[in-house]
Swiss-Prot record:
Organism: Homo sapiens (Human)
Family listed: Belongs to the SINA (Seven in absentia) family.
Name by which UniProt lists this protein: Seven in absentia homolog 3
Binding site for Zn(2+): 107, 114, 126, 131
PANTHER family named in the record: E3 UBIQUITIN-PROTEIN LIGASE SIAH2, SEVEN IN ABSENTIA HOMOLOG 3
Keyword vocabulary terms for this entry: Metal-binding, Mitochondrion, Zinc, Zinc-finger
């Protein structure tokens, strides 16, 4: 009986996933935009740290992470993994932030406590191969986050490749105050802070004749996703506002990235 119940639940999940795919294609196919359906993953790093803090508080229940992340993109070119980053683009240029230009950076994947260290040139392959983070390509894409109703903490992440660089999009559901979850969305450049200053990203929510835009300069992944969210330098939505723009538990975020100035290495070319 238990086996039958598990199989039936798996079938329902597949039906739900197919419905999400159909809905994404139906809504955005007319605009010709690349759409990626992203399921949430519980933030194991945040959960682990919270467990360590709450071990001395037995009245708080333990949290069991579940719901693996899956990315489903709709575009004929989305399977191609292209590495546009050039080695001479990726040196650490901020002496105050990095005294040693060859200091390796830590893994910035917000989902896991990963002990990996490496140079910026190999961050993208690491996220792609070890953490299974998919890559979308194109100047304008649509990020469709599903199951927004799941309890915090949860993350939806994807990499975005355009203008010869890779960006990391993170949507996080987190409780800053107990019982009051919020959604935080930010775009970070997989590069140095100097390179990040050369770009502008825009996040747009659009539903039922309502539109909400957030436009900012991306932060570098060297500055850590957690610090960006703590500083509030990102799009912040409370639960009621997120529900206003969501459709059947899914939130569609339009993403656009533009170059605000020509990088020195590109000007030489």
């Amino acid at each position: 009986m238990l086996f039958f119940t598990q199989c039936f639940g798996a079938v329902l999940d597949l039906i739900h996933l197919r419905f999400q795919h159909y809905k994404a294609k139906r809504v955005f196919s007319a605009a010709g935009q690349l759409v990626c359906v992203v399921n949430p993953t519980h933030n194991l790093k945040y959960v682990s740290s919270r467990r360590a803090v709450t071990q001395s508080a037995p009245e708080q229940g333990s949290f069991h992470p579940h719901h693996l992340s899956h990315h489903h993109c709709h575009h004929r070119h989305h399977h191609h993994l292209r590495h546009h980053a050039h080695p001479h683009h990726l040196h650490h240029q901020e002496a105050g932030l990095h005294a040693n230009p060859v200091t390796p950076c830590l893994c910035m994947c917000p989902l896991f406590s990963c002990q990996w260290e490496g140079r910026l040139e190999v961050v993208v392959p690491h996220l792609r191969q070890i953490h299974r983070v998919d890559i979308l390509q194109g100047a304008e894409i649509v990020f469709l986050a599903t199951d927004m109703h799941l309890p915090a903490p949860a993350d939806w992440i994807i990499m975005h490749s355009c203008l010869g660089h890779h960006f990391l999009l993170v949507l996080r559901k987190q409780e800053r105050h107990e019982g009051h979850p919020q959604f935080f969305a930010t775009m970070m450049l997989i590069g140095t802070p100097t390179q990040a200053d050369c770009f502008t990203y825009r996040l747009e929510l659009n539903r039922n004749h309502r539109r909400l835009k957030w436009e900012a300069t991306p932060r570098s992944v060297l500055e850590c996703v957690d610090s960006v969210i703590t500083d509030g330098d990102c799009l912040v939505l409370n639960t009621s506002l997120a529900q206003l723009f969501s459709d059947n538990g899914s939130l569609a975020i339009g993403i656009a990235i533009t170059a605000t100035e020509v990088l020195p290495s590109e000007a030489e070319m």
